[in-house]
């Protein structure tokens, strides 16, 4: 299944706020909430499916990519659900988004694809690059790159940067301090339901 490129508002109306996908919030008409499901029981499969879809659309990844992350998380030590979230959060496109260098994850992915971003002084143009503690993220020293990102930083620095990241406005540099903990996830999600959804595939 390919990456979603359709209307983002339609997705957040169905799944709720997804800050990685869009900075808009769902506007529901009064009395329209859960109209289609208020009189019938929602199946457990649908609940798991919707949690899975939240992850996929928030982080902007394909079905195959998400399944691969679940498989990696299952082989790792610790809680599969928590490891899964750590893998997704440490993607370069997400780190750029959480630092406030881009308004959304698709916006961050575009910066990476267009070679505006350096990791440890080397250009990285792979959005799925897995960041590690002590990695530092900077802007390519070109006026166009700095102008694009400086505008984002000025606006989005009002939002709190999670504890596992640091951004220096003076140096225009982001730093990955550590692997994030569960409380730093910027998404309302039940990751255990996602793991259960993939229990027969991973």
UniProtKB/Swiss-Prot annotation:
GO terms for molecular function: rRNA binding; structural constituent of ribosome. Residues 90-153 form the S4 RNA-binding domain. Keywords: Chloroplast, Plastid, Ribonucleoprotein, Ribosomal protein, RNA-binding, rRNA-binding. One of its GO terms (biological process) is ribosomal small subunit biogenesis. It is found in: Plastid, Chloroplast. It comes from the Eukaryota. CDD domains: S4. Pfam families: Ribosomal_S4, S4. The keyword Iron does not apply. SUPFAM superfamilies: Alpha-L RNA-binding motif. InterPro entries: Ribosomal_uS4, Ribosomal_uS4_bac-type, Ribosomal_uS4_CS, Ribosomal_uS4_N, S4_RNA-bd, S4_RNA-bd_sf. Disulfide bonds: none annotated. Coiled coil: none annotated. GO terms for cellular component: chloroplast; small ribosomal subunit. One of the primary rRNA binding proteins, it binds directly to 16S rRNA where it nucleates assembly of the body of the 30S subunit. With S5 and S12 plays an important role in translational accuracy. HAMAP family: Ribosomal_uS4_B. Part of the 30S ribosomal subunit. Contacts protein S5. The interaction surface between S4 and S5 is involved in control of translational fidelity. Belongs to the universal ribosomal protein uS4 family. This is Small ribosomal subunit protein uS4c. The lineage of its organism: Eukaryota, Viridiplantae, Streptophyta, Embryophyta, Bryophyta.
